[in-house]
Amino acid sequence: MREIVHIQAGQCGNQIGAKFWEVISDEHGVDPTGAYHGDSDLQLERINVYYNEATGGRYVPRAILMDLEPGTMDSVRAGPYGQIFRPDNFVFGQTGAGNNWAKGHYTEGAELIDSVLDVVRKEAESCDCLQGFQIAHSLGGGTGSGMGTLLISKIREEYPDRMMMTFSVFPSPKVSDTVVEPYNATLSVHQLVENADEVMCIDNEALYDICFRTLKLTTPTFGDLNHLVSIVMSGVTCCLRFPGQLNSDLRKLAVNLIPFPRLHFFLIGFAPLTSRGSQQYRALTVPELTQQMFDAKNMMAASDPRHGRYLTASAMFRGRMSTKEVDEQMLNVQNKNSSYFVEWIPNNIKSSVCDIPPRGLKMAATFIGNSTAIQEMFKRVSEQFTAMFRRKAFLHWYTGEGMDEMEFTEAESNMNDLVSEYQQYQDATAEEEGEFDENEGAEGEEQPADY
């Protein structure tokens, strides 16, 4: 019941995905060969959310791995859980997208997409009641961004009523991996606004800061960063996989978090994050988890929630705790920091409690917030985009693959619209009545306000 099909695209997506399957397999007691060596029936009760049961009791991930070059997949295959995946579910090309969104979306990616969709169909058909898809990819490269968004739009056509959740790695503010990141990211966001249901925004720099500042790792590797992402990915779906007192699933999450359809880009966080040596010196309590969870330093994307306001938020607790205490803490957060929550959505934190904590912890919490501060991220990318696009720098790489400049202009204005929508709701108060009419043009000046 309620299966989720997992797709990882491009180098970044495959590396995050590989880490994610290590975390999930560990939680469910599945070893690298797919055999079950767990210690509790609860691990098996709803293992089919993420796994197919094959012959001989092997558990095989419902995962589809795609890339336009074989390199990363070979390293996934050689990694600790490489043998657990179904060999037919590796779909790769030989050419690479060369950090070019157009190659991933229109030329190279378009050639490979049908074979990916065949695998998606096969996985979806083996589901009892498919809940939705989760996609791990980055927005700065070529494959994850270009081909990833192509796949999302194709799946959207074929499964319009299924949830589409993405874990999208945005370009970092100070660290740039490729020069054309702003182009690729803007073109991708243009797609995600229209076709995804929930986008969890991640960025490497914020992850580095967490590793460095909170976990006290002197030289964080991508493996460390990806581990952070994967515990959040696991936390988001723990309610589907383990029994809980207050459940949530992808659809409940969306209904509670998305007040306006376009504003579905979320900040994510996790608690407790402690350095390896200091764990035994603190007892975990719900208040402590709540405090750390809402801490700006804990956000996995480089935007500071203190610069905006929360439209909505969701807190998913794991472990044995009283729901009363959870409710009290949530109320407490909203009362103490009321200026950081919009007042026109009362009680805007959804909480859920799942009984089984992650391995090695007594309790943990996953945080998902819909904050207007996320506009900082889009603004930053948009500024870099405009700087290059004004001079038409690097554009020939894209037009050479058959793209039109028009598409860039559209993507740019779509992203700027998104920023101003966030800003509009950040400034809004409960009193302005005429403001939120469907026709955004009528900004409340035309019709007389009836107070």
From Swiss-Prot:
Any one GO CC term of the record: microtubule
Q: Which InterPro entries match?
A: Beta-tubulin_BS, Beta_tubulin, Tub_FtsZ_C, Tubulin, Tubulin/FtsZ-like_C, Tubulin/FtsZ_2-layer-sand-dom, Tubulin/FtsZ_GTPase_sf, Tubulin_C
Q: Give me the stretches of Acidic residues compositional bias.
A: 429-451
Q: Where is this region: Disordered?
A: 426-451
Gene3D superfamilies according to UniProt:
Helix hairpin bin (1.10.287.600), Tubulin/FtsZ, C-terminal domain (3.30.1330.20), Tubulin/FtsZ, GTPase domain (3.40.50.1440)
Record-listed GTP binding positions:
11, 69, 138, 142-144, 204, 226
Keyword Nucleotide-binding belongs to the record: yes
Superkingdom is Eukaryota
Query: Which coenzyme or cofactor does it need?
Result: Mg(2+)
Q: What is its main location?
A: cytoplasm
Q: Which UniProt keywords apply?
A: Cytoplasm, Cytoskeleton, GTP-binding, Magnesium, Metal-binding, Microtubule, Nucleotide-binding
Query: What SUPFAM superfamilies does the entry give?
Result: Tubulin C-terminal domain-like, Tubulin nucleotide-binding domain-like
**Binding, Mg(2+):** 69
Q: Which GO terms describe its molecular function?
A: GTP binding; GTPase activity; metal ion binding; structural constituent of cytoskeleton
**PROSITE patterns attached to this UniProt entry:** TUBULIN (PS00227), TUBULIN_B_AUTOREG (PS00228)
Record localization = Cytoplasm, Cytoskeleton
Q: Which GO terms describe its biological process?
A: microtubule-based process
Q: Its function?
A: Tubulin is the major constituent of microtubules, a cylinder consisting of laterally associated linear protofilaments composed of alpha- and beta-tubulin heterodimers. Microtubules grow by the addition of GTP-tubulin dimers to the microtubule end, where a stabilizing cap forms. Below the cap, tubulin dimers are in GDP-bound state, owing to GTPase activity of alpha-tubulin.
Family the UniProt entry places it in: Belongs to the tubulin family.
Quaternary data: Dimer of alpha and beta chains. A typical microtubule is a hollow water-filled tube with an outer diameter of 25 nm and an inner diameter of 15 nM. Alpha-beta heterodimers associate head-to-tail to form protofilaments running lengthwise along the microtubule wall with the beta-tubulin subunit facing the microtubule plus end conferring a structural polarity. Microtubules usually have 13 protofilaments but different protofilament numbers can be found in some organisms and specialized cells.
Name of the protein in question:
Tubulin beta chain
| Species | Naegleria pringsheimi
